[in-house]
């Protein structure tokens, strides 16, 4: 099988267990073990690349990070998962993008990017992408996060267009918030990406409604799916819904104890892509994606996606 090309963000996540620290401070107790700030490999598309690789499919990652200790950590992290990093470039002029992830008492996160704009991940250029890339890949996965700034935005949109014209499936994780629409160029790029995608994935709370310009998640998904695009709405403990044309499929979530939600959507994306490339139906692919996400949230770290053996074992004893 030809590899999946994952083009997009890669960063170092600094996970800050604020709720644990605040509780300890309020009670006058010592911080529990394992409650320190942790630096881990992150980036939504990089996480998805690792999720696909752990499920046994070949993966090629294209992106940019700083030529520093964090950048080396990120490259080594991808290679440890057997992700091909030949299209990962070090930018000597920028430090590696950092994301501060502050966790509350439920494991939900609030993210702060550092820097907020013009980070290393937006430095990817068209010349990083080989001229024959269309002949070398089976699927392209991208994110809305890269559409904020050039050269990343134009590089991604051009590759999406080329893949669409040549029959290579394109999946697009929206992965932006409402403030994106305050930037006319960013908003325009999102609309372009919407028309170039075969599969659109996003959260029910904000991402799918934002992309469709419709506040109700179901109406938003239906409008995006009218032209035959597959639209997948992730909704946490409720599960996920798939829309395509007039078809709707619901896949319930698996019940697990939530430890950390970081990377759950990225894991879902990777498992869905892997399942479809392995020939599973949309319904079965959604079930596998929900199972993979459930395993992810029961662990700690954005790279908590399961291996093929772990996913199969979990599915053998479902707890939906």
Question: Where are the regions a protein language model picked out?
Answer:
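A short, aliphatic-rich alpha-helical micro-motif
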Residues: 131-135, 193-194, 225
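Hydrophobic beta-strand scaffold residues
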Residues: 59, 85, 170-171, 201, ...
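Beta-strand->loop->alpha-helix junctions that form or flank phosphate-binding loops
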Residues: 64-67, 86-95, 223-225, 232-234
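Conserved beta-alpha-beta core of the PfkB/ribokinase-like small-molecule kinase fold
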Residues: 139-222, 238-240
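Conserved phosphate-binding/catalytic loop of the ribokinase/pfkB sugar-kinase fold
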Residues: 101-153
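Glycine-rich phosphate/adenosyl-contacting loop at the front of the ribokinase-like
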Residues: 1-64, 69-83, 257-259
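Conserved phosphate-binding/catalytic region of the ribokinase-like
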Residues: 1-5, 14-18, 33, 161-165, ...
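Short beta-strand scaffold segments in enzyme catalytic cores
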Residues: 98-102, 239-242
């Amino acid at each position: 099988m030809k590899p999946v090309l994952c083009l997009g963000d890669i960063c170092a996540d600094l996970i800050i267990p604020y709720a644990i620290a605040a509780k300890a401070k309020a009670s006058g107790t010592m911080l529990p073990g394992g409650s320190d700030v942790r630096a881990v490999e992150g980036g939504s598309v990089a996480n998805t690349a690792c999720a696909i690789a752990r499920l046994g499919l070949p993966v090629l990652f294209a992106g940019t990070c700083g030529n520093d200790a964090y950048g080396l950590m990120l490259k080594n992290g991808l290679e440890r998962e057997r992700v091909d990093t030949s299209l990962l470039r070090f930018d000597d002029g920028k430090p590696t993008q950092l994301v501060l992830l502050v966790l509350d008492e439920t494991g939900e996160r609030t993210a702060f990017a550092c820097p907020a704009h013009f980070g290393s991940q937006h430095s990817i250029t068209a010349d990083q992408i080989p001229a024959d890339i269309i002949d070398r890949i089976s699927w392209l996965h991208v994110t809305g996060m890269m559409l904020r700034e050039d050269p990343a935005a134009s590089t991604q949109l051009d590759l999406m267009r080329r893949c669409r014209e040549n029959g290579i499936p394109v999946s697009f994780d929206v992965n932006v918030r409402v403030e994106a629409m305050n930037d006319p160029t960013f908003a325009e790029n999102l609309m372009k990406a919407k028309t170039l995608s075969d599969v659109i994935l996003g959260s029910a709370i904000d991402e799918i409604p934002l992309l469709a310009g419709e506040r109700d998640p179901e109406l938003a998904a239906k409008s995006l799916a009218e032209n035959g695009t597959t639209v997948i709405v992730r909704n946490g403990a409720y599960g996920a819904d798939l829309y395509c044309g007039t078809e709707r499929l619901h896949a319930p979530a698996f019940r697990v104890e939530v430890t950390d939600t970081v990377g759950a959507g990225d894991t879902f994306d990777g498992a869905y892509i892997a399942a479809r490339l392995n020939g599973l139906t949309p319904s079965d692919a959604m079930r596998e994606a929900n199972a993979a996400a459930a395993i992810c949230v029961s662990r700690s770290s954005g790279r908590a996606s399961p291996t093929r053996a772990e996913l199969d074992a979990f599915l053998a004893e479902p707890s939906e």
